[in-house]
């Protein structure tokens, strides 16, 4: 019990110190609000205002705490200042070859009826990937060099039905710009197949990228136009390697690569494919990183 109590106080002290740093230049009520939100999320493991409020254990009615936090959220206008402090507080912990991850997710509001600009989204948490009401989320993180922990540098909740909406690519490019601004140097961007888009590829050409391809993608294989998926099925992986997963599962896979050309910009890239991750389909990746040997393939 003593160790548990000590750990709790240590966690709270670290959260308070962090909040103090990212609150530089804002007034005391907003600083208190930031501390309450950060500690409430950490202690409750939830982003619901009601759960955050309960974990603050204030000597007032729960309703009053909820109303205070909601009021502060509605009137909060120090986002740019806090974000700047946040980036400065984290510092440069990304190493000489930083890796950024980009992901589109969703927030499902299954029972929501009156939320503003409710959109149709694919519920990624459901097994059948059903369509529900909710919002899209665009996120970019940079991995720390040593611990490989993700540090969020861009997070945007949006709806395709809002008046301000232009395109999903607009938010993706803003998330890429956020990484560029934070790092100020060349990095490797990792994207899932939802980002298999010529505009994204062109936008990332000044940096390194690794993008998972969809099965419909067509490339030039030695001048001839061919479907990437059909072509990869004909080729065997030449490099054997073992992958470890979080549940201590080991899987032996076979990896190889080949040069391809994109028809739309006539630029050469490396196509890396992996057999064995799924019994049904190989994993297909496109990258602008140069591959000269086995180590380069494994690195991708």
Language-model segments: what does each one mean?
Residues 3, 21-79, 144:
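Short, positively charged, Gly/Tyr-enriched micro-motifs
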Residues 44, 61, 132, 277-278:
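Generic detector of ordered secondary-structure context
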Residues 50, 135-138, 170-174:
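Short, contiguous clusters of charged residues that form electrostatic/catalytic patches at enzyme active sites
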Residues 66-147:
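Active-site-proximal, Lys/Arg-enriched surface segment
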């Amino acid at each position: 019990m003593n160790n548990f109590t000590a750990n709790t106080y240590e966690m709270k002290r670290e959260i308070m110190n962090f909040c103090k740093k990212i609150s530089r230049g804002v007034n005391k009520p907003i600083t208190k609000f930031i501390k309450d939100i950060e500690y409430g999320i950490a202690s409750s493991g939830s982003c619901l205002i009601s759960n955050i409020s309960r974990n603050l254990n204030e000597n007032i009615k729960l309703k009053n705490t909820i109303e205070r936090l909601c009021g502060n959220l509605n009137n909060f206008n120090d986002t740019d200042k806090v974000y700047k402090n946040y980036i400065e507080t984290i510092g440069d912990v990304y190493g000489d070859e930083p890796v950024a991850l980009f992901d589109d997710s969703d927030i499902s509001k299954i029972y929501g009826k009156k939320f503003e600009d409710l959109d149709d989204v694919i519920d990624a948490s459901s097994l059948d990937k059903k369509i529900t009401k909710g919002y899209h989320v665009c996120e970019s993180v940079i991995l720390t060099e040593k611990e490989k922990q993700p540090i969020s540098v861009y997070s945007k909740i949006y709806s395709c039905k809002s008046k301000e909406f232009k395109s999903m690519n607009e938010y993706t490019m803003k998330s890429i710009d956020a990484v560029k601004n934070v790092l100020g140097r060349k990095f490797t961007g990792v994207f899932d197949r939802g980002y298999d888009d010529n505009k994204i590829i062109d936008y990332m050409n000044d940096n390194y990228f690794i993008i998972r391809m969809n099965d419909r993608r067509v490339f030039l294989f030695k001048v001839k136009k061919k479907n990437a998926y059909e072509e990869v099925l004909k080729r065997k992986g030449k490099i054997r390697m073992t992958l470890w997963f979080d549940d201590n599962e080991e899987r032996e896979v076979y990896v190889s690569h080949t040069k391809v050309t994109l028809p739309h910009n006539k630029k050469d890239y490396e196509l890396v494919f992996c057999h064995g991750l799924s019994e049904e389909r190989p994993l297909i990746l496109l990258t602008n990183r140069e591959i000269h040997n086995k180590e380069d393939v494994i690195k991708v």
